[in-house]
């Protein structure tokens, strides 16, 4: 039985915040339960009633959604029917192209519905983000050479000219589906992770066999070819730096924290979901780069703080960004990616808890700011699904 949102309880909150997400498997189809529970409790402190809803469970005529609210009393997620929320926090992750296609139209419709304010509009894909960042002359020198994979011969061309490359899906996350391909004395070597985030490694004597294998591996999904950067320690462990940029209680961007993510031994990626771990950025860089670490850290911060301004200028309103930055073996800094729906696991693993606490609290503080002022954020420009 689905309960309706209790009117008397709802009136104790000044506003409602709906966390929009794609349903997970299980009896209670709420993903990111731990994170969403924290948001609910913080929302209660701030006078916000928080619930989770799904874009495929919307009653447009009655302006209602079916979703779940966390009950601190019972410690459970309770299924209810809610009025349309005042603000929407988008945490939808699409498992594949079919899921994206299924949710695209209802989300577009919700974006254009009067009385609903999206805290931010999700970025489309890695190629789209790369193109927007390339338009900024200050960021352009820090972006690795990148192009869309149109045909398998593109890979052969890159290998002929550069000897190695990095192949990554346009819509992927968690380091899934990535490959490093390189020329080796007796053919070609391939290292990476499958779409299920399992390690993969192989060798091919001929270009044709390697390309046939890559064709099956990519399986028709959109991919990017990128210059391979040697972002690893002296012992060969891959690492990068996650900078979390968020809007705060005043509607301004701030750098919430920096965390180094080091991949599992032998991994081509630094992602934690592939068995890596997180460390504090300053001491980690100090061990690797000595006296140069201070300058590298300042470059990382400068890049991270520039990215939100550029993306909002070309894309539209954003609420937070995970900016991934690499440092190669000679200390050069590279802007790798920007993600509008960042995770927080790297900061939760650090010894200091301030960044981890702020990472969770800031979206709610910004939501309260938006609801209290209804101004102070740029109007939506070209953001689209």
Regions of interest found by a model, annotated:
Residues 13-27:
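Nucleotide-activated donor-dependent transferases that construct or modify glycoconjugates
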Residues 19, 89-90, 167, 226:
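Redox-cofactor binding/interface segments in oxidoreductases and associated redox assembly factors
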Residues 31-38, 45-146, 150-154:
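Conserved N-proximal alpha/beta basic substrate-recognition cap immediately N-terminal to
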Residues 73, 182-187, 247-251, 328-330:
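Short acidic-glycine loop/turn motifs at beta-strand connectors
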Residues 109, 113, 119-226:
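Active-site nucleotide/adenylate-binding loops and adjacent lid/helix of ATP-dependent enzymes
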Residues 208-240, 244-326, 360-373, 379-381:
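A long amphipathic alpha-helix within ATP-dependent nucleotide-binding catalytic cores
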Residues 261-269, 339-352:
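Glycine-rich phosphate/pyrophosphate-binding beta-alpha loops
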Residues 325-327, 332-342:
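A short beta-strand motif that forms the metal-chelation/ATP-contact edge
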């Amino acid at each position: 039985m689905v309960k309706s949102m209790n009117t008397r309880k709802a009136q104790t909150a000044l506003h409602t915040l709906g966390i929009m997400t794609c349903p997970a498997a299980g009896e209670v189809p709420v993903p990111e339960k731990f994170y969403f529970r924290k948001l609910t409790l913080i929302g209660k402190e701030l006078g916000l009633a928080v619930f989770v809803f799904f874009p495929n469970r919307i009653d447009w005529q009655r302006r209602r959604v079916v979703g779940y609210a966390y009950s601190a009393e019972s410690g459970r997620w309770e299924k209810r029917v809610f009025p349309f929320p005042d603000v929407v926090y988008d945490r939808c992750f699409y498992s594949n192209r079919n899921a994206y296609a299924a949710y695209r139209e209802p989300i577009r419709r919700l974006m254009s519905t009067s009385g609903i304010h999206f805290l931010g509009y999700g970025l489309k894909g890695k190629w789209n983000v790369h193109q927007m960042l390339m338009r900024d002359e200050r960021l352009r020198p820090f972006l690795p050479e990148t192009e869309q994979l149109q045909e398998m011969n593109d890979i052969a061309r890159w290998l002929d000219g550069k000897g190695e490359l990095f192949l990554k899906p346009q819509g992927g996350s968690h380091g899934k589906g990535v490959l490093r391909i390189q020329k080796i004395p007796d053919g070609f070597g391939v290292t990476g992770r499958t779409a299920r985030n399992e390690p993969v490694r192989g060798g091919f004597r001929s270009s044709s066999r390697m390309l046939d294998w890559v064709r099956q591996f990519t399986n028709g999904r959109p991919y990017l070819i990128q210059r391979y950067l040697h972002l690893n320690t002296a012992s060969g462990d891959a690492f990068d730096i996650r900078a979390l940029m968020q809007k705060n209680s005043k509607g301004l961007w701030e750098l919430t924290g920096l965390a180094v993510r080091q991949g599992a031994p032998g991994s081509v990626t630094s992602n934690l979901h592939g068995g890596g771990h997180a460390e504090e950025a300053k001491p980690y860089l100090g061990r690797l780069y000595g006296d140069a670490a201070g300058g590298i850290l300042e470059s990382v911060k400068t890049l991270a703080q520039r990215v939100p301004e550029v993306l909002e200028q070309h894309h539209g309103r954003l609420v937070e960004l995970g900016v991934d930055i690499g440092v190669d073996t000679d200390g050069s800094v590279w802007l790798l990616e920007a993600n509008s729906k960042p995770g927080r696991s790297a900061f939760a693993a650090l010894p200091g808890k301030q960044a981890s606490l702020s990472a969770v609290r800031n979206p709610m503080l910004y939501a309260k700011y938006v609801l209290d002022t209804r101004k102070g954020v740029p109007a939506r420009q070209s953001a689209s699904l």
